[in-house]
């Protein structure tokens, strides 16, 4: 057959397959274009969690893990498992960068400020990493203040009290909790600097709502009607803020939602909001590399391992043109993560990132920037790129709110975009691989509590090939098989590093 051009990799972020259609937004939504694909095209399912994507057994996937594996075309061992193993075998406590951090604080006489998401969700961080770091630092005689970031998004919306109680029970004597802050404020990634400013004010200047202890901070938030994600920055009695000679250690291992708060804390030329006089930090440490700019003022306990010969790099090496498209909420995913942790575009790689709407939560604007993404996708198809990667954020971002009516509207907005894409591809003679990176909006009710379900799932996700070889069949697989499938459609061989295999079987 004639090689299709362009080939579109269309990622429906958070669109899983549920066995309970009554609570599934994709099942309840009117999606004629997705339905057309499922009726008329080869399709299968993908595994997006656990060892199939480089995570511990049973651990749900997420967008970072998903896009990393998609772009790599191989199973990539993720940071969660690496850090868990280091804590288990004791090597974490001998980590060179952590040792240097401790030495600098012993020399300055300062306090170590530890910030991390306190839950067992395992998407951005883990409570056990916070506990291990507190022990490692206090064992060497350095006092610790912990800045608790409450989750409620990758775990049930009102589970923080249990995690705070667990943390308090495990902390060494020389460690205490200084602040309690919902991730809505501390872990923004879309330039909502007014939120980040409030988290910064609490952690660094001890300015926020008062509470006698961390458990009461959570209880007070619940009394105000706030769930864990949205707990307003709260300062625990006795915490007076950071001072010159202190150090700051971010325990989150996922980059995208750590970058903004860390820039406010340490970036020399930071100007997004007025931080006032910042402490002269003796040391700044991250669990991982957060970006090349962060590397200029922070060390990393576990530096990123470069993934070579990704989908984008291989296409670029063949002299072909590619286009990356997503609204700003998913900007890092189709660029940094898909390119194996590389910030800069590949040769011949163009990008367009329309702004996500500035609303408090995305159930208030479930269409998000999908209309603009869809219009730009049609333009890119008509422009003659060889490869286009597009991410629709709606199913995931709206799914995180737990609102089924809003998630239905989100899926319908994405389906309109699918219709526009299919029409443009038919005119251009192109093809598409339509997938999801993990599930979310297909489960809106928590089966255990009966309340809203806001986390990712371990459900299978769809994979569909449009415009592929005549009579082709599709087998089931995992995310590592996506890049080989795309390269197969493009008529390209695989780099030796790609151990995934094409899902396309020919008659």
From Swiss-Prot:
Pfam families: iPGM_N (PF06415), Metalloenzyme (PF01676). Belongs to the BPG-independent phosphoglycerate mutase family. One of its GO terms (biological process) is glycolytic process. Substrate binds at residues 124, 153-154, 183, 189, 254-257, 330. The keyword Manganese applies. The active site is at 63 (phosphoserine intermediate). Its cofactor is Mn(2+). CDD domains: iPGM. Signal peptide: none annotated. It comes from Paracoccus denitrificans (strain Pd 1222). Monomer. This is 2,3-bisphosphoglycerate-independent phosphoglycerate mutase. Gene3D superfamilies: Alkaline Phosphatase, subunit A, BPG-independent phosphoglycerate mutase, domain B. Catalyzes the interconversion of 2-phosphoglycerate and 3-phosphoglycerate. PANTHER family: 2,3-BISPHOSPHOGLYCERATE-INDEPENDENT PHOSPHOGLYCERATE MUTASE. It comes from the Bacteria. GO terms for molecular function: manganese ion binding; phosphoglycerate mutase activity. Mn(2+) 2 binds at residues 13, 63, 437-438.
